Regions:
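Extracellular/luminal regions of secreted and cell-surface proteins that mediate adhesion/ECM remodeling
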Residues: 344-470
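An active-site-proximal structural segment forming one wall of the substrate-binding cleft
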Residues: 105-121, 139-166, 185-199
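Aromatic-lined substrate-binding rim segments of carbohydrate-active enzymes
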Residues: 72-130, 143-145, 200, 204
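Boundary/entry segment of secreted carbohydrate-active catalytic domains
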Residues: 31-86, 90-92
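Active-site groove signature of glycoside hydrolases
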Residues: 124-134, 153-186
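N-terminal Sec-pathway targeting helices
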Residues: 2-20
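Catalytic-core regions of glycoside hydrolase
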Residues: 166-323
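Catalytic cores of secreted or luminal carbohydrate-active enzymes
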Residues: 300-360
């Protein structure tokens, strides 16, 4: 009997020991260290940010088959100070209207894209046959020849997907703007766009001149959703370029006079309905172009409102000078804003595309949290890599990836980022906390609109003190 009691005592002791060890393992992190996080002030900045894929672009034109190429960026201009961000390249194929592009012409195209790739720019690319409003005279005499040119140019373009961000149009129309062409029937437009999508890399965005052209090509008014966006399909790639932006009530022929409905998607809708369409669509595909014709629609307050609804991420820096100069002469007025007193042009420049403001950072137990707001007109259509880094006072570096799809950081909304940190495994001491956003395609760091100090680890957002209690 005594033996049984003794065995029972041993068993009870063993079970209690297991419970104690389990509690120790479960509560150890909470019980044997203390973490104190001190955030840096999240002060918003009104500075211009040199971030990719967005902003006012400069335009450069090239004629394939010409004796020489001019306007190529010099190798010495590739440093950050001289580098242009987003640029538009118009490549004229009129010398080969009725024949295949020569090897020499394709080599010239390669030279052009290679130069801008080395320059570190992001390219909006438009192929065309006309710069003088005479497309019907200079375009190929057969649709098959245009399709062949798409095949040939795509072989070169696909080598530069880290440089070519999007392509505008389907090669036809005056200045490549999909108008006054032999090939603007619904059938031809659909054939050309589907073929262009087939031969170009899925990472390159495509775009058409008007919303109704997109609806006709896809035979649908459906917009991408979070489930279908960025899946490589034509619908997920096909955005808009509007070179009549804010020019008239119908954006100089971009919109129509039909009310939106399920039965009228093949018609151009009235302005308000087309703006609502773009407000949904262009959260997932790019929209840009150029403003034109000084009028009340592009007065500063109205322009900001519509550019925001259309989610515009890029605009021509040279056209229309009357409108751009009007914005430069106007002041943005909002006493509660860091942009109060800035010129209208500068305000718009700082809101084209995405603009991330870190609102606050915090540590809840071992969960580190970052809250940021996209105050720009659009999302970033390329997914970013996100990283939190702790650097100890003696230089040890601990980096942790953050899981969040930045392509869904919709304008006007706040993104909540969270990551669990292994604080119990860190030595006691002081750590500087850094946050970094990087575009993996360009290997470019994305700058937040804050006044944080910066070094190679990213932006310093706070200090973490860890002390051990044993």
């Amino acid at each position: 009997m005594k033996t049984n009691k003794k065995s029972f005592s041993y068993l009870l002791f063993f079970l209690l020991l297991l419970v104690f060890l389990a509690l120790f393992a479960f509560l150890g992190i909470r019980s044997f260290y203390r973490a104190n996080y001190m955030p840096e002030p999240c002060t918003e900045s009104a500075d211009e940010l040199s971030n990719p894929y967005i902003g006012f672009y400069h335009m450069y034109g090239y004629v394939l088959g010409s004796d020489s190429l001019s306007n190529l960026p010099a190798a010495s201009d590739s440093d950050a100070k001289n580098r242009q961000g987003i640029v538009m390249l118009e490549v004229n194929l009129q010398n080969f209207s009725n024949e295949d592009l020569s090897d020499s012409a394709l080599s010239q195209l390669d030279t052009i894209l290679s130069a801008w790739q080395r320059h570190g720019s992001q390219v909006i690319l438009r192929f065309l046959y006309d710069w003088d409003g005479k497309a019907m005279e200079t375009e190929p005499q057969s649709l098959e020849q245009i399709l062949r040119h798409m095949d040939q140019t795509a072989e070169v373009v696909n080598r530069y997907t880290d440089c070519v961000f999007l392509m505008q149009g389907i090669f036809v129309g005056n200045c490549g703007e999909m108008n006054n062409s032999h090939y603007m029937s619904d059938e031809d437009c659909t054939t050309l766009m589907h073929h262009l999508a087939e031969v170009t890399d899925p990472s390159v965005f495509l775009s058409v001149r008007t919303p109704v052209q997109r609806r006709k090509i896809l035979d649908s008014s459906e917009r991408p959703t979070k489930e279908t966006a960025f899946d490589g399909s034509l619908s997920s790639r096909l955005g808009l370029f509007n070179d009549g932006m804010l020019g008239t009530a119908n954006d100089t022929g971009t919109y129509g006079d039909t009310a939106a409905s399920a039965d009228t998607y093949r018609s151009a809708w009235v302005r308000e309905d087309e703006l609502s369409f773009q407000n949904e669509l262009c959260n997932f595909v790019p929209n840009g172009g150029e403003v034109t014709l000084d009028n009340p629609l592009n007065d500063l307050a109205h322009a900001i409102q519509d550019l925001s609804r259309m989610h515009v991420s890029y605009l021509n820096s040279e056209h229309d000078p009357a409108v751009l100069d009007k914005w430069k002469a106007a002041a943005y007025k909002d006493k509660a804003s860091v942009f109060n007193g800035l010129s209208g042009y500068d305000y718009i420049e700082r809101h084209l595309g995405y603009r991330y403001v870190i609102q606050d950072t915090a540590l809840d137990s071992s969960d580190f949290q970052i809250r940021l707001e996209n105050v720009g007109f659009s999302v970033c259509y390329r997914k970013l890599d996100l990283q939190l880094t702790l650097v100890s006072s003696d230089g040890e570096v601990f980096s942790f990836p953050i899981s969040s799809d930045s392509r869904f950081w919709i304008p006007g909304t706040t993104a909540e980022l969270s990551i669990s940190l292994p604080l119990a495994r860190l030595a006691k001491g002081s750590y500087t906390v850094y946050f970094q956003m990087t575009d993996p395609v360009l290997q470019r760091e994305i700058l937040p609109a804050n006044t944080f100090s910066h070094d190679t680890h990213g932006f310093s957002i706070g200090t973490l003190e860890i002390s051990k209690l044993y």
